[in-house]
Design a protein with these regions (language model features):
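A conserved catalytic-core segment of Leloir-type glycosyltransferases
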Residues: 37-110
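Short, solvent-exposed amphipathic helices
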Residues: 119-124
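Short, solvent-exposed loop/turn segments at secondary-structure boundaries
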Residues: 14-18, 130, 151-154
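Short acidic, glycine/proline-rich loop/turn micro-motifs
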Residues: 70-71, 149-155
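Active-site proximal beta-strand in glycosyltransferases
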Residues: 3, 115-117, 130-150
Length: 156
């Protein structure tokens, strides 16, 4: 099986449990004889492509969208302050990852994938875009909900 795997947190950029899970599950998927292409965030200091432990990793180089992003997002997002840069980077990572997966790997290189796996809301944009443009089956993994992250208080 050939799997497209989208997770904003992956080796070597780990923030918490999501990245640890992603590393362990992709390692096991590979051990079972499957091929896996991981799409993850690039902090600007990493290779845009590498094979690590037999796992293909794509890290698109981000562009700065902060001059335009506040103009095109809703008011509630503009109130995020410096967190808006994080969201802009996440959104850009998703668009670039989906574009590379659909246009380069599938359309140009004619690679065959069996399923798309995308993890948490941080990679949901790319997973949904890839699903809509390829009609591949997709699995969306939710790793926690806001109530769990904020000890029941929400972000409001």
């Amino acid at each position: 099986m050939n799997i497209g795997f989208f997770c904003y947190e992956y080796y070597p950029l780990l923030v918490g449990g999501l990245g640890t899970y992603a590393i362990e599950i992709t390692r096991k998927i590979k051990e079972f004889g499957n091929d896996i292409s991981v799409f993850t965030l690039n902090d600007g200091n990493l290779s845009t492509y590498e094979i690590w432990n037999g796992i293909e990793i794509h890290r698109p180089m981000l562009v700065n969208v902060m001059d335009i992003f506040p103009i095109v997002v809703k008011e509630d997002l503009r109130r995020w302050g410096w967190h808006l840069k994080f969201f802009a980077d996440i959104y850009t990572y998703n668009i670039l990852s989906a574009t590379k997966f659909v246009n380069l790997l599938i359309k140009k290189q004619r690679r065959k994938f069996d399923i798309i796996s995308f993890h948490d809301w941080l990679s949901a944009f790319s997973g949904i875009i890839c699903k809509q443009n390829t009609n591949l089956p997709a699995v969306f993994h939710i790793h926690s909900i806001e109530e769990q992250r904020s000890l029941g208080g929400g972000s409001g």
